[in-house]
Structures are given as C-alpha cells and as structure tokens.
Regions:
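Conserved acidic, metal-coordinating active-site core of Asp-based
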Residues: 132-200
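Active-site phosphate-binding/coordination module
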Residues: 48-152
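Acidic/polar N-terminal loop/beta-strand segments that form early-domain functional surfaces
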Residues: 29, 37, 70-73
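Short glycine-enriched, charge-decorated loop/helix-capping segments at active-site entrances
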Residues: 40-47
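Non-catalytic pre-domain segments flanking phosphatase-related domains
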Residues: 1-30, 34-35
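Short acidic/His/Gly/Ser-rich catalytic and metal-binding motifs that mark active-site loops
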Residues: 34-38, 100
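A general structural motif
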Residues: 20-23, 64, 87, 157-159
Length: 200
C-alpha cells in the first residue's frame, strides 16, 4: 500500500471500522492535498490525466460524508472551487471565513482575539488596513516583503486576512503586530514555489 492510500472500510475490522463509520466530515486543504500541482482537479501529482479526486468526492457524498475544503484562499477563489466540486461548505482565509451552507449563503467571519464589530460596515481586512500596521511592516523591511495578492493578475481583495510574502524575521513582525494591539497573529500559510510577477 502506498503512503497516500488508505485502506477501505471493508479491509478494516473491529473498533477502527466502527469509528470510521461515524465520520461525517472531511476537512482538507486544497493545494497539494486535494488538488494536483497547478490547482488541477483532473490530473494526478505527476501531471497525468486522472479522475481520482472526482471519484473520491462522489464516493464520500454517497456515503453521507461532507467534504469541507480549507484554505488560505479568499472567498471568491475557494467559493468557485467548492461550487465546481459540488461542495456546500468551506473555510477560507486560514480559518477567518467560514461558509456553513453555500446554498443558503450562511457564513461568518472568525477573527480570534481581534476586536471586530460587524456593524462597523468594514470587513476585518479593512479594519486591519486602517490601523496602519501593514504599512509599518512594509516600511520596516523595504524590498523584503510585499502584499501577496491572489492570482497573478493582482487580485488583492481579502475579507479577513492580509496576505504578505517575503523573508522577514517572524518574531519582529509579531512584535509590531502586538504593539498595534489588534490581537493579530503572524502566521505562515506555506512557501511559494512560483511567482509570476510582483503584485504590489
């Protein structure tokens, strides 16, 4: 059995079979997990044509198991991923945006320790931008860090998080965030393997 193949329920016995029979949700990342390189649904990791992902999603749906993609992607991107795959829920922006029911448009922002009042008329992202903390980080490390906008066309809009990319000392950035008093956490959402062009 390869490292990425799980046994089927029929191959299991006893307690493990009973435990797996109670699974109702599969939470999974997208890139290099559900999707092949290049965010492709119909290819395998070697680039060969494959329907394995589609077959797995269909089999899980038939078993009554809901697949919930989770990603750092913004709403527009992950919404389309979920819609095309026939999924009804997703978690975007590193946990900051939860779509409970896509068909009913039932969603909410999760902002952790960041004080946020939805009645302010701004998104959490806009509230963060208004503090000036992002500009402070960019000014502290010129040419070392920049906004990471979604897609190579420079689509910037995010609702909860601020995407940045570069090589800066994590502890110093976190200190700047702590000083701003916004309850923000500096987190890594992975390493980029390809940059098509600067997006700032």
């Amino acid at each position: 059995m390869s490292h990425n193949t799980l046994p089927t329920v029929a191959e299991l016995s006893g307690e493990m079979r009973e435990r797996l029979a109670t699974v109702k949700y599969v939470f999974t990342d997208l890139d290099a997990t559900m999707l092949a390189p290049g965010s492709c649904v119909l290819r395998d990791n070697d680039g060969n044509p494959s329907t394995k992902l589609v077959e797995a999603v269909v089999a899980l749906a038939r078993a009554g198991i809901q697949v919930v993609p989770t990603s750092g992607r913004n709403r527009t991107m992950i919404h389309e991923d979920a819609r095309v795959l026939g999924l009804n829920s997703y978690i975007g922006e590193m946990g900051g945006l939860v779509m409970y029911d896509l068909k009913a448009n039932d969603w909410e922002y999760l902002t952790g320790d960041m004080p946020y009042d939805p009645s302010c008329g701004l998104t959490p992202h806009q509230v963060i931008e208004q503090t000036g903390v992002c500009e402070k980080i960019l000014a502290r490390w010129p040419h070392k860090i920049e906004y990471h906008n979604d897609m190579s066309t420079g689509y910037k809009y995010r609702e909860v998080t601020v995407g940045m990319r570069g090589d800066v000392p994590d502890d110093e950035v976190q200190a700047i965030l702590d000083e701003a008093g916004c309850g923000l956490i500096w987190a890594c959402n992975g390493h980029l393997t390809h940059l098509s062009k600067p997006t700032t």
